[in-house]
From Swiss-Prot:
Entry's family note: Belongs to the class I-like SAM-binding methyltransferase superfamily. rRNA adenine N(6)-methyltransferase family. RsmA subfamily.
Entry's Gene Ontology cellular component terms: cytosol
Gene3D superfamilies recorded: Ribosomal RNA adenine dimethylase-like, domain 2, Vaccinia Virus protein VP39
Predominant localisation class: cytoplasm
Pfam families given in the database record: RrnaAD (PF00398)
Catalytic reaction equation(s): adenosine(1518)/adenosine(1519) in 16S rRNA + 4 S-adenosyl-L-methionine = N(6)-dimethyladenosine(1518)/N(6)-dimethyladenosine(1519) in 16S rRNA + 4 S-adenosyl-L-homocysteine + 4 H(+)
SMART domains (alphabetical): rADc (SM00650)
Provenance organism: Helicobacter pylori (strain Shi470)
Keywords for the protein's UniProt record, in alphabetical order: Cytoplasm, Methyltransferase, RNA-binding, rRNA processing, S-adenosyl-L-methionine, Transferase
GO molecular function, one term: RNA binding
Keyword Signal: no
Designated name of the protein: Ribosomal RNA small subunit methyltransferase A
């Protein structure tokens, strides 16, 4: 019997109906590789192997061993490449689509890594509902939603109750999808000069991420007050105020009230 490790944030999805809903929610993948983070008890992995070849990253050696034993006992139409490695260091050379029941404690970092990675063309993941709602929020409600909208389209698909897991978590989870959009990527990559598109895209994402951290550092305070505290952006405050005037927005706006962060950042960098 496998015991979930609290240190790795393990809650294994065991409800067949929700496992099937996740598999059914996958978009057409050809020609993308399918990459999974976390093999868990192997329930989702085995269902995926009925439809796709799969590469799975798993840091827990005991779960890797259990998965190998399961594959010996039941043959699947497609092959599994099981990589015993921390998914935070995931690096693929070919375009891929990501799927995962994400560990709660590093879910945000893993999603941001995928959004920043030009090779990742989209993702279908489950995370704590509160986290999923932040990524899928509309307009400029928070830094995560702005980052997501800058590179693709996010959709909240369905909630998963604690009873669907072993052991059950204390909170609801949600499955959501992000599909990268080439036109949005092109706009993000145009922020900075780089010899290759993928490098420019990654630098553009990182620059926007850094800027948003400053803008949303204290969400209830005005944008101006937040940027005054930023070592990187306090000297650009006058240009921010100029931009707000051009957009007919008051100087007292909060970060969540900015209409177009990409346009603002482009103005600061090139204006």
């Amino acid at each position: 019997m496998v015991v979930a490790k609290k240190s790795l944030g393990q809650h294994f999805l065991t409800d067949e109906s929700f496992l099937d809903r996740i598999v059914d929610a996958l978009p057409p993948l050809n020609p993308l590789k399918l990459i999974e983070i976390g093999v868990g008890l192997g329930d989702l992995t085995l269902k995926l192997l009925d439809h796709y070849p799969l590469k799975t990253y798993e840091i827990d050696s005991s779960l890797c061993e259990k998965m190998r034993s399961k594959l010996k006992a039941q043959k699947k139409p497609f092959a599994l490449e099981l990589v015993e490695k921390d998914a935070l260091f995931l690096k693929e050379e070919e375009p891929y689509f990501l799927i995962s029941n994400l560990p709660y404690y590093i879910a945000t970092r893993l999603v941001l890594n995928a959004l920043k990675d030009p090779k990742c063309r989209g993702l279908l993941v489950m995370a704590q509902k509160e986290v999923a709602l932040k990524f899928c929020a509309k307009d400029s409600q928070n830094a995560l939603s702005v980052l997501t909208q800058a590179i693709g389209n996010a959709t909240l698909l369905f909630d998963v109750p604690p009873s669907a897991f072993s052991p059950p978590p204390k909170v609801f989870s949600s499955v959501f999808e992000v599909i990268k959009e080439p036109l949005k990527e092109k706009a993000l990559a145009s922020l900075l000069q780089a010899p290759f598109f993928e490098e420019a895209l990654q630098k553009g994402f990182e620059t926007l991420e850094d800027f948003l951290k400053a803008c949303f550092s204290s969400p209830r305070k005005t944008l101006s007050n937040n940027l005054k505290k930023s070592v990187s952006y306090r000297e650009k405050l006058d240009k921010v105020l100029d931009f707000l005037a051009l957009e007919n927005q008051p100087t007292s706006v909060r970060a969540s009230e900015i209409k177009d962060y990409l346009k603002l950042l482009e103005y600061l960098l090139k204006g």
